[in-house]
Amino acid sequence: MSVKRNKKVSVACVHCAKSHVTCDDNRPCTRCIRKGLEESCIDAPRKKVKYLRDVPEDQLPSVLRSTKQVPPVNAVKLKMEPGILPNIPLDYDGGTIRQSAPANNGKNNPETQQTLSNGQITHRPKFLSSAADLEYSILSDIIHGDSLFNKIPVNFLYSNPTEKTPSPINQGSLNGQQDLHFSLQLRSKPMNQIRGNTRAIYSNLLGPVSHEILQSEFNLYTNHFPLQPQESLDGTLDFKRMTIGTLSPHLTKFDKTINQYYLNFANTFPEIYDSRKIPNLSYALEVEPPEYREIPHDTEIPHTLRFTTPSEIYSLVQTAFPSTTGFHALLRYLKRRFDKNQLVEMCRCLAELRPIFIASTIDLTDEDMIFMEKSHQRTLLEYEKFISQVGTPTCVWRRNGQISYVNDEFSLLTGWNRLELLNKMTFIVELMDGDTVMEYFQTFTRVAYQGFRGAETMRICNLLTPIKGSVIKCCCLWTLKRDAFGLPMMIIGNFMPILTLPEDVGF
C-alpha cells in the first residue's frame, strides 16, 4: 500500500514555508484552513537577488516583482460591495500600491520576444549592443595607422547624456509617479552651489583661450579641453584664485599686511601708498566648507557619481555610459601632445586588447550595457563612502581614462581640486608627464585582460601640478574592478609621494 504524497508547488504560503511543510495551490491552503489561519494565508515572498536587495518592491520593474499579489484586507472588503470597486483609482500611499496589478504583468509579450529575437539574429555577426559595437570601432580606429590621423567617426548611436529622460508615466509605468518624484527631488537640489562657478574655476586653467571657451556654448562634459599648468612667480597656487574680473595689480595696490586691495590710485594718498609696513609673520590653513569638499552628485555629469542612493541608481539609470565620446577625445588629446613614434607605441599596447575585447562583448546587449553602468554607479557609491575614510590619495577612473572620483588627499597632493577635475571631461593622463603616460598604457595592458594578481604597481609615476614645471614623483598602485561580465569597469589608483631628503641632511 503506497502513501499518497501531496503535490509540490512552486510557491508555498508563509505558514507552510516557515514550518518547512508541503503546501498546495489553494489560497487559503488546506493546512491553514485546518489551523484557522485563513486570513493570513498568502504566498511567501521570494528571495531577491543580491544586486536588488536595496531596491524596494514597489520600485522594481514589473517583470522582477512577484507575479502573485494579494490585495490588502481593505481592498478585499471593498471588492465585496457592488458599485464601489470600478470607481477606485490607483492610489500611492507610503510608497505602496493599494490596488493590485493585473495578473498578466509578469508574463512576457510574444510580440516583444519576437522583436528581440529578430534583433539578435540580425546583429549576430556584429556586437549585440550598439554601445559595445561603437566602443570597439573607436578602439580599432586608434590602433590602425590610417584612421589614427585621418578618420574619426562622428555619428554616435548614443543619446545626448544631458537630455532629460522622458517620464515613465507616459509609458504606462506603475512607478511613474515615484520616478517623477525622484527626478523632481534631484533637479531641485542647488547643484550650482556645490559645483561652484564654472567660469571662476576654469578662468585660467584651460590655457590662453580660457575666456573664449567659457563664453561659448561648449558642453564641458562632452567636449574635451585639457587642463594646462600655469606659470607661478611665487611658487604658490594663488593664481588659481584670480578669477575673471579681478582687479589688476597694475592699477591698485595690494597690502599683504591686511590682505586687501586699495580702492584708490597712487596719486590719491601718496603718503599711504609709499609707506612701508613690516608684515606680521602669520600662517593659516585654508579649509573649504563641507559642501565644497563633497563629491558633486549631479544627473547632468555623466562620468562621475550621479545619484546618492541605490534606489535612484536602479530606477533612474536608463542609458549606457557613452564611452565612445571619451575615446574620441582621448585620441585627439594624444595626437596633439605626442609625436607619431610615441603614438605607435601606445597603439601597440591597445592592439593586444582588441581580440579579448571582442570575445568579452560580442554577446552583450544594450540592456547589459545599461546594467554595467548601474553596477559602476552602485560600486562607486559604495567606494566613495570607504575612500572618504582613508587618508591615502586616491583617484578613480573608467577604462577609457575619464576621472570619476578623487578624494581630498589627492587634491592636497597634486593641487588639482575636485571641482576642477570633475566639472569637465578630464583624463588621468592629463595629470601625468610623457614617460608616465607611456607607462600608463603598458600597465593597463598588463592588468586589463591578462593574468592580474589584484594589484599592479606602475614603474614610473610623475604627476603634474597646476604650476608649470612642477612635478610630483609618486608610487602608484592600481586596483582594477571588473563588472559582472569580466570587463574592466573602473581603476582605483592610490598615489603616495616619494619624499627625498636634501643632501646636506644626515643621520
UniProtKB/Swiss-Prot annotation:
Keyword Zinc listed: yes
Main location: nucleus
Ranges where the PAS domain occurs: 379-451
PROSITE patterns referenced in this protein's UniProt entry, alphabetically: PAS, ZN2_CY6_FUNGAL_1, ZN2_CY6_FUNGAL_2
Annotated compartments: Nucleus
Molecular functions (GO terms): DNA-binding transcription factor activity, RNA polymerase II-specific; RNA polymerase II transcription regulatory region sequence-specific DNA binding; zinc ion binding
Renumbered residue ranges of the record's region Disordered: 95-121
GO CC annotation terms, alphabetical: nucleus
Alphabetical keyword list: Activator, DNA-binding, Gluconeogenesis, Metal-binding, Nucleus, Transcription, Transcription regulation, Zinc
GO biological process: cellular response to starvation; gluconeogenesis
InterPro entries attached to this UniProt entry: ERT1_acuK_gluconeogen_tf, PAS, PAS-like_dom_sf, PAS_13, Zn2-C6_fun-type_DNA-bd_sf, Zn2Cys6_DnaBD
Biased composition (Polar residues): 97-121
Function recorded in the entry: Transcription factor which regulates nonfermentable carbon utilization. Activator of gluconeogenetic genes.
Record-given protein name: Transcription activator of gluconeogenesis ERT1
UniProt source species: Kluyveromyces lactis (strain ATCC 8585 / CBS 2359 / DSM 70799 / NBRC 1267 / NRRL Y-1140 / WM37)
